Amino acid sequence: MKYNLVVAGGGLSGVAAAVSAAREGLTVLLVEKSGCLGGAISNNLVYPFMPYWTKQKDGSDICKKYLSQGIFKEMKVRHDRYVDDCKDHEFNSEYLKIVLDDMTAEAGVDVLFHAVVYDVKTDNRKISSVEITAKAQKITIEADFFIDATGDGDLFYLAGCDYQLGRESDSLCQPMTTCFRMSGVDLDLFTEERPRLQELYKEKQAKGEITNPRENILVFFGVGEDVLHFNSTRVVMLDPTNPFDVSKAEVIARKQIHELIGFLKENSAAFNESALISVAVNIGVRESRKLKGVHILSGDELINCTRFEDSIALGNYDIDIHSPTGTGTSHRYFGDGEYYTIPYRSLLPKEYDNLLVAGRCISATHEAQASVRIMPICCCLGEAAGTAVSIAHNTNKNVHTVDTKALQKKLTENGAML
């Protein structure tokens, strides 16, 4: 079997990569390990969208400038037809699954679920084929181009590309987190009691009665009139690319969930009628392998709001680093009107001419990745990668010789904000 493009990973970056390339006439196979598209949204219960806009003055008014547009905007608009009064950061993951199915089908993308790439074949500076396993079958797929949108950089790792695991000083990664939701919560009472609960949480943590090292109880509203979304578990000092470590982390996080629910029910009447209604299928990974590509995006470049000539996406989410060793979360925020650009070169492996990387595993330092890892930005990176492959294919170029001005022109024509 042969395609023009194989995309590994069906999260937002992989979907955007596949759809953007297929819309330009390429034959595309999208390989996804689970049974649905959406990645962190579908399998890790990640919610909500972190801010993908900046605020700027328009005359005397303050208005939003949306930085993540293109396919991301299309996806959000299509989703919002199903959900009344949906705010910019909100979504219903179940409807998003349907939207992503529709978008890939309409573009003509072949989607292979329950499948993972486990080996690659290379020829000089090209990947010639990938070996996929699905339902106990081994499948060889040849392609002209490949995009790694796996999050963990599995494809570029198998191909032998240079990479950095976690932070540069000790290879420790940001913590893993399993999100969960509770219904039947008195949200008004919880909001009133939240400061007291937070202090009590810290007291019990200091006594060792709470084992979760996270410094606070992080929750989000907006998923239901009596539902709380928790992003509160924290598993540290384990390797997200080691299957035995990840298996350990899954159990630790579920234990933390049980512990936290007990604490809330015991100490707040807001949870008297509450019930656990959902736990993420898989633990969420903030950081793992990051490509060491043609350009390694740095934290300083983000802080300085660098404008790269080969910019293919924008961002201004804060540099949000959850301590890899335990308690604490650091933030470096951007001011109104401030944003940075992400260069095409950060999607380029040094080793191959027909491989691009999209999503949270692009070429970036620990600090820079802490900002670019959010889903709206990842979606834009995927669209840029898929569009670049379509240009390379249609002009007989490789990914390193793509005309970045032509790439930028095509992206803006398709609604991207550069």
Show which residues each predicted segment covers.
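N-terminal Rossmann-fold NAD(P) dinucleotide-binding loop
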Residues: 14
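Conserved beta-strand-loop-beta-strand element in the redox core of flavoprotein oxidoreductases
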Residues: 121-140
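Flavin (FAD/FMN)-binding glycine-rich loop and adjacent Rossmann-like elements that form
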Residues: 40, 71, 138-145, 149-418
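Membrane-embedded transmembrane-helix bundle of lipid-linked glycan/lipid transferases
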Residues: 6-8, 17, 22, 125
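Beta1/beta-strand and adjacent pyrophosphate-binding region of the FAD-binding site
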Residues: 1-11
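Conserved N-terminal/central alpha/beta ligand/cofactor-binding core
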Residues: 20, 26-27, 32-119, 174
